[in-house]
Structure formats: structure tokens, C-alpha cells
């Protein structure tokens, strides 16, 4: 016989197969009750990881719409920053214990989830962490095809070049037992020709950094061509020097006749074992 926690996770997983990002708060709240949680609040981080933004349609225990929170000045933000469970009590729900749990995909911080639990203890924390892990995976799986999510995590519109590059970049953070990768790009909303890429191939880590001249659309397109050429040739097993030559050739083929050499990117490719 399955436990309450197992039923909650299994039911949520089954329910979300044909649901979108907009359905996630409702489905999580419904199935979390089976695990003993009386109230659920899901927040995701914005592009610059300065704010925690609630998924739409959620309300606090008093029935008020959830507000955006600063990461550097709130208890949910502390859970996000410290990557640990933060305990407090709900001010709207008669002091019910409230757990703030980070949403993680590996080491990438997605946001936080707040869970009100009338009974606090080790089992409750374990169930909260399990639920948070599943919710994080669902956010990751639903966000690539959700325009509402893309709008939610942007404090202002992206430039066209930033739109191109953000959709090509790998996650900003990755870690396993042997290596940690952590990245950041600024200005996040106006980045032009700056980009990075990395990938594991067995025990080998490939890292590439691109810097096309300028901050306009042409710089973003040049960097995207460089990244695609790098990936394509890297996947086919080419050596570093040959990858660099392939990047240069791809940019030359795609550049209009007479375009200045300054529009080509500087690139750094590295491989570590």
C-alpha cells in the first residue's frame, strides 16, 4: 500500500502529463493536500535572480493575490539563496507552520515553494523536499513552450539579440561529483554578442565562450552562428583547433560581402578531463 506522500507525488505526476504551466499551481495544491499540506505557494526566479515571482492565480491563506518578493530581503529569498529549508509560521493562517523549500534542477535554482503543514516534523520536511523536487522538474519541462512563463520571469522586454541567445544557452549552473559550472550574463536584457556553451562527453567537459563585436542584432546572430558551429563540430568529435576553424568558416559564409572583420566574434574553447 502506498503512503500519503507517494499518492500525492504519483497523482500529481499523472495529472500533469496533459497540463500546462498555468495548471501547475492548482494541480500541486490539490495533490499536496494528500501529503498533509494545507496551503501551497510556488514562486520562480526572474532572469537576473533578484526577484521571486509567483506563478499566476495563486493566493495567500487570507485570500489575497501573492506578490513578487525580493530574494535579498525575505525568508523565501533566504531559502533560495542558502539552498535550504527555512521554517516560519503563516501570519494569515493562525500561526500554522510554514516551510519554504528551494526548487532545484540539479544545482540550478528555479525558485521556491511554500508549504503550510499543520504537523511539522522530519516526515513533513522529507515530503516537502520530495514535492519540491517534482515541482522543479515540472517547471523545467513545461517552461520551454510557455509564453506566459517567459513573460513572468522578465522584468522588462528583451532585445531581439537577447531573445535569440537566451533560447540557445544551456542552464546557468551545472554540477556533478567532479565539476561545477556557474555562469552569468549581464546586461541580461540587452546582451548582444556574448554567449557561452558547455557540455559533458563522458568524463570530458567542453566549455566555450563567445564575444561578437557590438550589442545589436547582428552581433547576436553572429554569436548564435558561432555557437551552433561549435556544437555541431564538437558533437562530431572534432579537435579544438578544428572547431575554431569551423567556427570561423561558418561566420565567413554567413557574413554579407564586405562586412567588417570586427563583426566576427572572439571565441575561447576549452576541454578538460
Q: Which role fits each region the language model picked out?
A:
Residues 1-18, 141-144:
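Signal-transmission linkers at sensory-effector interfaces
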Residues 8-12, 19-42, 71-75, 164, ...:
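Amphipathic alpha-helical coiled-coil segments that mediate homodimerization
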Residues 13, 24-84, 90:
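Structured interaction and signal-relay segments at domain junctions
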Residues 111-121, 212-213:
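Short beta-strand-to-loop transition segments that serve as allosteric relay/switch motifs
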Residues 131-191:
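Regulatory cytosolic signal-relay segments
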Amino acid at each position: 500500500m502506498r503512503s500519503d506522500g507517494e499518492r500525492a507525488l504519483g497523482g500529481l505526476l499523472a495529472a500533469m502529463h496533459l497540463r500546462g504551466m498555468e495548471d501547475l499551481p492548482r494541480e500541486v495544491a490539490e495533490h499536496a493536500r494528500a501529503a498533509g499540506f494545507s496551503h501551497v505557494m510556488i514562486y520562480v526566479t526572474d532572469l537576473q535572480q533578484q526577484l521571486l515571482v509567483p506563478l499566476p492565480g495563486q493566493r495567500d491563506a487570507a485570500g489575497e493575490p501573492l506578490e513578487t518578493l525580493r530574494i535579498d530581503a525575505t525568508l523565501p529569498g533566504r531559502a533560495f539563496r542558502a539552498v535550504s529549508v527555512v521554517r516560519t509560521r503563516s501570519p494569515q493562517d493562525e500561526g500554522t507552520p510554514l516551510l519554504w523549500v528551494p526548487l532545484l534542477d540539479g544545482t540550478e535554482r528555479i525558485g521556491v515553494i511554500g508549504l503550510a503543514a499543520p504537523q511539522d516534523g522530519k516526515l513533513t520536511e522529507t515530503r516537502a523536499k520530495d514535492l519540491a523536487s517534482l515541482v522543479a522538474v515540472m517547471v523545467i519541462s513545461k517552461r520551454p513552450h510557455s509564453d506566459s512563463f517567459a513573460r513572468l520571469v522578465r522584468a522588462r522586454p528583451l532585445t531581439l539579440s537577447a531573445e535569440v541567445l537566451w533560447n540557445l544557452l544551456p542552464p546557468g549552473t551545472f554540477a556533478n561529483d567532479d565539476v561545477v559550472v556557474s555562469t552569468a550574463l549581464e546586461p541580461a536584457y540587452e546582451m548582444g554578442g556574448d554567449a557561452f556553451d558547455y557540455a559533458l562527453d563522458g568524463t570530458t567537459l567542453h566549455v566555450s565562450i563567445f564575444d561578437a563585436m557590438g550589442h545589436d542584432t547582428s552581433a547576436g546572430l553572429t554569436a548564435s552562428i558561432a555557437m551552433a558551429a561549435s556544437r555541431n563540430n564538437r558533437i562530431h568529435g572534432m579537435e579544438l583547433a578544428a572547431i575554431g576553424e569551423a567556427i570561423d568558416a561558418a561566420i565567413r559564409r554567413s557574413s554579407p560581402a564586405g562586412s567588417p572583420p570586427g563583426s566576427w566574434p572572439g571565441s575561447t574553447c576549452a576541454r578538460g578531463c
